[in-house]
Regions:
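N-terminal low-complexity/intrinsically disordered extensions
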Residues: 1-79, 106-109, 141-142
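Glycine-rich oxoanion-binding loops at beta->alpha junctions
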Residues: 37-74, 122-172, 183, 220-227, ...
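Solvent-exposed alpha-helices and their adjacent loops that cap or buttress functional pockets
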Residues: 72-77, 82, 106-108, 140-144, ...
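Short glycine-rich or small-residue beta-strand-to-loop segments that form or flank ligand, phosphate
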Residues: 80-90, 148-151, 172-178, 204, ...
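Short Gly/Thr/Asp-enriched flexible loops that form oxyanion-binding sites at enzyme active sites
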Residues: 96-100, 181-197
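Short internal beta-strands
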Residues: 110-119, 204
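Short, acidic/small-residue loops that bind anionic groups at enzyme active sites
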Residues: 190-219, 223-230
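Polyanion-binding loop/helix "lid" in catalytic or ligand-binding cores
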Residues: 230-250
């Protein structure tokens, strides 16, 4: 696979002027454990390919390293965030929701975190779905539950209406948890936001039991789904093997 033609640039909404409220280390030093925008993770780790790129004078294709920055764009005390889970359910969805809410609340001091119910339908007024006000007490034991507290839905929704909803509610960051279809929708939403000149960040979080998302080596939910399916297959095999002409149905 050739990586040199892949654009991994992440656009920014503007200058980063606000000091991150995240406290790192016992002395609260702001430069400790923060990630710089120039930190990178290589896409291709094969030595021969890297040497060839050096010979050809090409830059290494790499992703920005994930992690907290010392300076941020939004003021967390005034920021409003939205979460949505789309597509098929898979193991780990509630864990994702819980982790995001707890980090935003305790790490960044945010108090306006909203969960849109039933996938992209939650943004469309005609469906009249409720919006959840997500707090730490709401997600305290969420990791012990299967499925998604926000529910889900399949199929496309009008992108313009989704962006209209984000604009009406003054949402600054949208977290979209889903598979390849959801991430394609996230791209369309981000493009529409850019065309309108809005200051909204779209964050795509890959999840799928199919593990078929491009550039993602292992997606959330894949291992658990594989383990559970294996147990079911083994049980059916053992049962059917114990009888003449036995057949196991999964």
């Amino acid at each position: 696979m050739k990586f040199d033609s892949i654009d991994t640039t992440i656009s920014t909404l503007g200058p980063l002027k606000i000091t991150s409220p995240i406290r790192r280390g016992e002395n609260g030093a702001l430069d400790r454990n923060f990630v710089h925008d120039t930190d990178r993770v290589l896409l291709d780790v094969e030595l021969n390919n890297l040497l060839k790129m050096v010979e050809e004078g090409k830059d290494f294709s790499a992703f920005e390293l994930a992690g907290p920055r010392s300076k941020i764009y939004f003021d967390p005390s005034k920021l409003r965030c939205a979460l949505v889970t789309c597509g098929g359910l898979c193991p780990g969805l509630n864990d994702i929701i819980r982790a995001i809410v707890l980090e935003l609340f305790f790490g960044y001091g945010m108090r306006n975190i909203y969960g849109f119910k039933y996938g992209l339908q939650g943004f469309i007024p005609k469906y009249r779905h409720d919006i959840l006000d997500l707090k730490p007490k709401t997600v305290a034991n969420l990791h012990e539950m299967g499925g998604s507290i926000l529910g889900s839905s399949r199929g496309p929704q009008p992108i313009d209406e989704i962006v209209d909803s984000l604009e009406r509610m003054n949402i600054g960051i949208l977290f979209m948890v889903g598979g390849d279809g959801t991430l394609m929708a996230a791209t369309k939403i981000a493009n529409t936001i850019t065309k309108r000149g809005l200051k909204v960040s779209v964050v795509g979080i890959p999840k799928t039991i199919d593990n078929d998302i491009y550039m993602v080596s292992r997606s959330i939910g894949f291992d658990t789904a594989g383990d559970v399916a294996t147990q079911a297959i083994k049980s059916a095999h053992n049962e059917s093997a114990g009888f003449p002409n036995g057949i196991g149905l999964i």
